[in-house]
């Protein structure tokens, strides 16, 4: 796809590069410490999309040599049972990273579960201690999707200092931490959201425009300044008239791609980078916990 569109930010290719590097790192670390890094993934219920994401993460772990500890629990699992399991994983010396696959069934308190994870094993970078470290520009495990966006921009030498960056979306998963990372890179950052007045006018100011809402086709050509860098974090499954489904982002790719200076595709953009950063966080946690970093 990158050959067809020369202005693509190819997250899939960069993720493959990162995983090749991580494979070598893991081999060296296993030789030095006597075990590989380990990632525990907790999934509750039978959400098909979540199951697919978990399989993808487990497959990626296997490819780079990270030990994967899967915990697929029934929908009726209680909060107390999950907290007990997380505490056990916090104490397990084989486990360097813990991830709770979201969303969870409605009877579970996701925030309390995320808070229960040892911050040094917070592979998703969502514990308040790690988010606080981000705000203070201190070392810590970073949220995977925002960190993946930043790594991709860095790969393509996208200048951020002094640039206008607009993030559409204010979630704790993407929008807020990504805005902080852009600010740390000396961009001038605006966060837009569902209550923003005249979203199109705000978006058109952006040198770097990031859509992270989960609304197919939200960003149209009329919202993009010529030459802007457009990063599409949205992953939405839409059903076509034929009955077949396909993945699309929050950006109308066909309309925006000819205008943009750079643009990420969906799929093949930020999704693979999120998984690569999850692996990277797990390896970083392993190194820190073994006094190697």
From Swiss-Prot:
Binding-site residues, NADP(+): 169-171, 194, 235
GO MF annotation, one: methenyltetrahydrofolate cyclohydrolase activity
Catalytic activity field: (6R)-5,10-methylene-5,6,7,8-tetrahydrofolate + NADP(+) = (6R)-5,10-methenyltetrahydrofolate + NADPH; (6R)-5,10-methenyltetrahydrofolate + H2O = (6R)-10-formyltetrahydrofolate + H(+)
Pfam hit, one: THF_DHG_CYH_C
Pathway: One-carbon metabolism; tetrahydrofolate interconversion
Record's keyword annotation contains Glycoprotein: no
GO biological process, one term: tetrahydrofolate interconversion
InterPro entries: Aminoacid_DH-like_N_sf, NAD(P)-bd_dom_sf, THF_DH/CycHdrlase, THF_DH/CycHdrlase_cat_dom, THF_DH/CycHdrlase_CS, THF_DH/CycHdrlase_NAD-bd_dom
Entries under CDD domains matching the protein: NAD_bind_m-THF_DH_Cyclohyd
Keyword line: Amino-acid biosynthesis, Histidine biosynthesis, Hydrolase, Methionine biosynthesis, Multifunctional enzyme, NADP, One-carbon metabolism, Oxidoreductase, Purine biosynthesis
GO CC, one annotated term: cytosol
PROSITE patterns named among the record's database cross-references: THF_DHG_CYH_1, THF_DHG_CYH_2
Keyword NADP: yes
EC number in record: 1.5.1.5, 3.5.4.9
UniProt-listed PANTHER family: C-1-TETRAHYDROFOLATE SYNTHASE, CYTOPLASMIC (PTHR48099:SF5), C-1-TETRAHYDROFOLATE SYNTHASE, CYTOPLASMIC-RELATED (PTHR48099)
Subunit structure: Homodimer.
Function text: Catalyzes the oxidation of 5,10-methylenetetrahydrofolate to 5,10-methenyltetrahydrofolate and then the hydrolysis of 5,10-methenyltetrahydrofolate to 10-formyltetrahydrofolate.
Family: Belongs to the tetrahydrofolate dehydrogenase/cyclohydrolase family.
Protein known as: Bifunctional protein FolD
Organism: Cyanothece sp. (strain PCC 7425 / ATCC 29141)
Gene of this entry: folD
